[in-house]
Amino acid sequence: MNKVIQGNLLKYAAAFLLLQTLIITLAPAVRARTLAVDYRWSQWVALLLWIVVTYRVHLSIAQYLPDADPYLFPAAALLSGWGLLTIWRLDSGFGARQALWLGVSAFAFIGGLQLPTTLNFLRKYKYILLSGGLSLTGLTLLFGTNPIGYGPRLWLGCCGVYFQPSEPLKLLLVAYLAAYLAERIPMGMHAFTLIYPTIILSGIAILLLIFQRDLGTASIFIALYMIVIYLATGRRRTIIISLVLLAVVGIIGYYIIDIVHARIEAWLNPWNDPSGGAYQIVQSLLAIANGGIEGRGPGLGSPALVPVAISDFIFAAVAEETGLLGTIAMIATFGLVVVRGMRAALRAPDLFRRLFAAGITTYLGIQTLLIIGGNLRLLPLTGVTLPFLSYGGSSLLTSFLALLFLLLITNHLDEEPAPLPKPQPYLVLATCLILGLFTAALANGWWAVIRGTDLLTRTDNPRRIIEDRYVKRGMLLDRNDTPITSTSGTIGTFVRIYNYPDLAPVTGYNNPVYGQSGLEASLDDYLRGMKGNPTSTIWWSHLLYGMSPHGLDVRLSLDLTLQQRADEMMLGHSGAVILLNAQSGEILVMSSHPTFNPNYLNEIGSQLNKDPDKPLINRAVQGLYPTGTVIEPFAQALLGKTELTENERKSVYEAFGFNSTPQLQVQTAAPISATPHAADLHVSPLQVALASAALSDHGVAPAPRLAISVNTPTVGWVVLPTPGISFQAVQASQANEAAQAFTANGGGYWSHIGRASGDESQVTWFLAGTLANWQATPLVVVVTLEEDNGRLAQYIGQELLTGAMRP
């Protein structure tokens, strides 16, 4: 019966891995959305080897251990195959090495199946085995190396083959403790007399690891030691002592060992240094967030962006490509190993095998929680490996040896379970391990679902850059559908093109090095296709391609013909120009100078950041200038005079909205005051333009609009909501009278030149707008020059306004 159950479970595991291998093969075609690609075939070698090895082990278990637990090996086989394919997909060279180690582990496993199920040799030679393990670990202090050439020297190596003695030392420690305690407990010895010899040997092992700077493994040793003692004695104080010791080790490591200090800092404050010391954990969380619920698909994610993805961060790699569903299945598989392992302990025929089975289960459970918790920022990074999955021959071999001993213990045939007067410690341990795995699953859901959107929109998320090369980004169009910003190239080589670069301070940029700004940032959800597309389209695109759907085009209110004219006249001058539909709030011109060419941002980006002229700032909405005499038309409308007291000046500011920040689809600056005096208020040209609109539209200041519609695939062009709201600044009669008062020589529009003194230079304002009796679209223009040049400001404003009035 056990053989049938084990065989059926292995078939399910094989089907899952077969599907994963097939998807990895087709991934290049899916990503490129064409069949003319180079497919991935090499991972089929890994799958074939896994099938052969697994089938052979299955037959051997059925032959030598017919009564063994039928769930343990299928769980381990699934995890090892999953890890092998993940490693091979990330790096075929390391994948081939892992496949070789899988073969070696299986060979050792099959050979070990013929060991006596009593495991008396472990009891008999406990001191020799532990001493041998300690000696090998001690040799790393003299002859230790690191396969990558730097970092802690925890391996012994020769001829390109490396072995980490501290991995099997965990098993040897558990075997020693189980054998020693099983031998001494029946003697009824005093607690201290019972355990003090174990303290010496276990302490030597822990000190060796501390000298090696391997605090992750040292922490496991402390936890293993205390838990086995707790199981043997039932005294809860051992757990308290264990927690205290772990805290002490952590504190010592924090202040003495650089790498431990860095890891704890990265754990506590990862967002303070996301590109430095916390780079690993931040990229791990980004990978988990990128996986979402269903994952990007095997071969379709970007887990290689996470450092050491084949080993320390293999959980994050799996999470990105199989999502929350995949990681929950993985965590559940580890949970199955824990449950069946503790069942083996409770049903063991003698105390030694009971303690040994519980210790092995604890070792697998704690190491699993450490690595998964580190990937999820539940715990600091430790550098230990995920059993059965992570790259590493020593770890894989040790995991299979642990599995072997569990199977030997469960194959007790007709032997009755040994008496267990106090089962509570075992039940408490099992509950804690399962709760730990459950907490990890909840944390996984937190980062993948709850925080996923926030993480993926971070500018330091390199996956956005990769996606931009494969998914066409939507265009920014002017009101006549002339492209302002577009995307060229083919899938895999898409590049953002700025067709009208002078608008760069407004449209911003979408750059792999410098991130996003302007409309490219604020409209990113539409341009990336994550908003405006049906939910089913987004979900299907993620499921099938592992990416967003095609981006959507956004139509702006700008008129490129008028915009070009404004930019030509502003050439060589610093300042801003805004031409506004006074009724609807639609911005027809938004010019900011000096400007830059975002097509060459990679070459000039570093210079732009240092440029004293600040070309990156959109002066029309982010530039703040002193008001000076610019408020005279508004004072005339509200109070009927232009000579104001300080309180009257404040009332004008309040009435026309100078004290509030305009709401627009780009980042706008809030007004500021350099001193408590009202005359020192600094406002943006956009604020002045909105106030001016009230004089041309019966006292109503409109809500500004820049992005007016988006082209959706289902209903076509859809009008975008207006971010702000309009308000009545003054009565219509007051506004009309003020406009007439500022109309010169019976012209068709009102106008005013204002001046103010800035921090570094004079500022010139020019305001103009149509009158109330204008039969067409009411318009206003605002020109701001960072120089004392009223004639130029008037010329620019009049040219734009009259050109718009008589197109």
Regions found by a protein language model. Give the residues of each.
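Membrane-helix boundary/helix-loop-helix interface segments in multi-pass membrane proteins
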Residues: 2-213, 372-387, 391, 395-396, ...
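Hydrophobic alpha-helical transmembrane segments
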Residues: 46-54, 103-104, 320-339, 629, ...
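Membrane-interfacial entry segments at the cytosolic side of transmembrane helices
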Residues: 121-127, 191-196, 233-244, 418-431
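Periplasmic/cell-envelope proteins involved in peptidoglycan metabolism and beta-lactam response
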Residues: 124, 410-615, 619-624, 634, ...
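Hydrophobic, glycine- and aromatic-enriched re-entrant/interface helices and adjoining loop segments
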Residues: 138, 147-162, 230, 238-330, ...
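Hydrophobic alpha-helical segments of polytopic membrane proteins
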Residues: 192-210, 215-255
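Loop-to-helix entry and N-terminal half of a specific, functionally important transmembrane alpha helix
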Residues: 344-383, 389
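Beta-lactam-recognizing serine transpeptidase/beta-lactamase-like catalytic domain environment
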Residues: 541, 583-789
